[in-house]
């Protein structure tokens, strides 16, 4: 009898526990592979791959995103469409087509903003089809640098300006695997109904400027919690310039393109149409011109300039012009006075329409030199009659040139004769300008090939001063379409990305997936920088341009094992990709790109006083990026505190009942033994 009572009590306690604790036997299947604590952590805390929005600063304040304090942010995940009245901060799951309205509401509804713990953004190529347009930039990007007064003009019709605002919470763009991880954990929510659990996102996106309380560029540079935006531009001449000889210097035809772009998310900045299509067109033209016989006999000097930092105050072009004023080593062989005309290649990836590639020539001013460039473009077009290419002059009703590097040239010298070639007339045709959606699928490679073909022949016409369309040399200039297409996949896709054979033939890239955000400038700026401080794309461009514009003395080549050549007019190319590089005669140089308001001294950056003679420096925001450690996001499931309390109470109750039961059983057994 006594043993039966104890058995009944045990069964009763077990039933109580089972009714309180919602055990899911399926969990056992999930953890069969756990062999260590790290395995358990990986199962419980799922690392989410993606791209962060980071904290940027200028002289007047901050933009971008960050954890609000020095600790991690942990908040339950909820889809934006399910948001009603939030009581506590949540992680909002936002789709790309909801971004503009969401961030606009955050900026205008402070009560709503206070309930945002963090944001996960779901995007993908399918959203490009759904969206009519999405550009987080302004209607007139960088209007403060405009050489004309009408800064209210709407160049960017898809503008929302959301990337220029300050958000006091972390924002993270999910990769494809990140989207899958978040959807998987949310899909189990219905299965876990009534289990007192929440699916949360944990953001470890703390910025050093937040920790130190340095909330503008001047303060953070003083405290060393940020670095200036910038990098290294590259220029090269075809043929090489003899720096030692100043005699018989030829007029310079300068061709310009940009290599950097921006988006809401730091490392998801492809900039396919704006500006990488123009960069690839320039490289395609250089490749074509490098195969022309007698290039050394041209009447004018061809110079190619690829700029970085243009998105952040035209850092590259302003610094290049400043170095020309200083006659520094970075621009040895060039001078302001030698530049006769400038041809910039802007956005040229969306020129194809109705089987015809149409481009618009925007000129800085009316002059004989500008007309010469426009005439050369028309002659080049006519020589390519079978290619269905059309060059049109931009609408005279436009207020002036569109946002481009030429603005820096015009502000420096209003008499600059220049033309910028674009795939638009009165406003951007790129509806994803400075957006993470401006990727390879947003452009047409045939449009880029067409632009490269026109540019190559235009440059030959300008440099040779020969307007004869029947010229055999002109007809021999052909752009390699396969080369252009390969280069587009190298610079605008993660597969193969920078691991493509074309890039690896010149450098050993540190990253596979290209990121065309300017980044920060590391160490002391120099025309001969430590290559570990130079980005992959800049290093590739330097090697590629040095190779294509080079000549070799005689038929011999010399090797350079440590990246140094014995002769002053030689440079060492392909030293990264091969054990031994090759010395070639080339005028190819790095030009540091950073604000003219900054000075580097004794390992630190300082901001120089305003100089009234530098009109662009007067309006320069001086952009910096906050230092940060590794940025991580995890998702996992947590129990509600109420549930934890219930389990605690249940445990105490069961323990108490068990104790009482044991005492009762002991008493019954004692009495039974006495009776026996």
Swiss-Prot record:
Residues 1-28 form the signal peptide. The chain crosses the membrane at residues 645-665. Disulfide bonds: none annotated. It holds the Pfam family Ncstrn_small. It is found in: Membrane. Residues 666-676 are cytoplasmic. Probable subunit of the gamma-secretase complex, an endoprotease complex that catalyzes the intramembrane cleavage of integral membrane proteins such as Notch. Probable component of the gamma-secretase complex, a complex composed of a presenilin homodimer, nicastrin, APH1 and PEN2. This is Nicastrin.
